[in-house]
């Protein structure tokens, strides 16, 4: 969790983290210390007794149990991870969501309004879109 960005500022590096892990809060990678993230999966929590009880409760209340027990907590993790990239008005970066479920309307409606210009693509098209983004921001 220690921020060693000063030590590595002269070289490019790639870090791998788990959503909801120690890097989800309490670290501030300023300026160009973090210029992108690739989030694999929707962050849905594992099935357990607590989640089943939560799902059952909200299913009875409003029929929306799966979202409260799984979708919303998972998306919260995704948004926290994505939020590491853009911390200030001056930050620029790429957020790539790798999971077909993110293209579904029930996920798109959970995107922040700042993501309104998102692009859908397949894995083959992704490098081109990322390159075009950086060409427009260099």
Report each predicted region and the residues it spans.
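ASCE RecA-like P-loop NTPase motor cores
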Residues: 1-138
């Amino acid at each position: 969790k220690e921020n060693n960005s000063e030590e590595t500022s002269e070289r490019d590096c790639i870090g791998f983290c788990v959503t909801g892990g120690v890097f989800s809060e309490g670290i501030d990678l300023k300026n160009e210390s973090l210029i992108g993230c690739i989030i694999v999966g929707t962050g849905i929590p594992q099935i357990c007794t607590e989640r089943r009880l939560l799902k059952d409760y909200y299913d009875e209340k409003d029929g929306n149990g799966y979202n409260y027990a799984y979708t919303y907590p998972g998306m919260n993790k995704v948004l926290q991870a994505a939020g590491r990239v853009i911390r200030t008005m001056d930050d620029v970066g790429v957020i790539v969501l790798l999971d077909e479920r993110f293209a579904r309307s029930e996920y798109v409606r959970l995107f922040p309004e700042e993501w309104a210009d998102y692009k859908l693509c397949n894995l083959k098209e992704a490098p081109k879109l990322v390159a075009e983004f950086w060409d427009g921001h260099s």
